């Protein structure tokens, strides 16, 4: 019996270990800076003020429109959610069966073992009730800034950006990652854009080290709060 319990405990630990989110690592190729696909033309020294290949509209600002350009995203994320749910189910059933004859004849109800006469009557009654309540509240706030690079410019002018920032502290590392789509019109003259203007945003804030480990429950605690716990 003890051996069987040990096997179940080991199997549960393995399953819970597989459910743990992987630890983020730096230098992810997906978030690496994207370099321009074509090099800029070399400046020709021909004595002229205007050079071919270098132009800037006098009535437009110099914004990041090309692959490899840099954009600063201002993080100002605030989300809150709450949910209440309740359910109550009750059922009462009662059945009475009274028989005076069986197949057209009255059976002998004398008790051969003594005592009172036997009876063909039967009855059943039962009550069942289920009640449950749940409540969940969650809120998140993320402020700051992160500078990313232009990864792709779509034919309709939408700009795909992504990048990451790692902060190495004495107790671990802090990570901020973001990827999404930005309209060129939403980019300010200083090449900044608020995170609320980033479409299909994928924002990650995580970390490693003792502080991050302290906020994570142990494998046995995860078992008791997981759907595998039968009670």
UniProtKB/Swiss-Prot annotation:
Keywords tagged on the record: Bacterial flagellum, Cell outer membrane, Lipoprotein, Membrane, Palmitate, Signal
Domain of life: Bacteria
Subunit structure: The basal body constitutes a major portion of the flagellar organelle and consists of four rings (L,P,S, and M) mounted on a central rod.
Subcellular location: Cell outer membrane; Bacterial flagellum basal body
One example of a Gene Ontology biological process annotation: bacterial-type flagellum-dependent cell motility
Disulfide bonds: none
Function: Assembles around the rod to form the L-ring and probably protects the motor/basal body from shearing forces during rotation.
Family to which this protein belongs: Belongs to the FlgH family.
Lipid-modified residues, S-diacylglycerol cysteine kind: 19
Signal sequence segment: 1-18
Topology in membrane: Lipid-anchor
Name assigned to this protein: Flagellar L-ring protein
Lipid attachment points (N-palmitoyl cysteine): 19
HAMAP family recorded: FlgH
GO molecular function: cytoskeletal motor activity
One GO term describing the cellular component: cell outer membrane
NCBIfam families referenced in this protein's UniProt entry, alphabetically: PRK00249.1-4
InterPro entries: Flag_Lring (IPR000527)
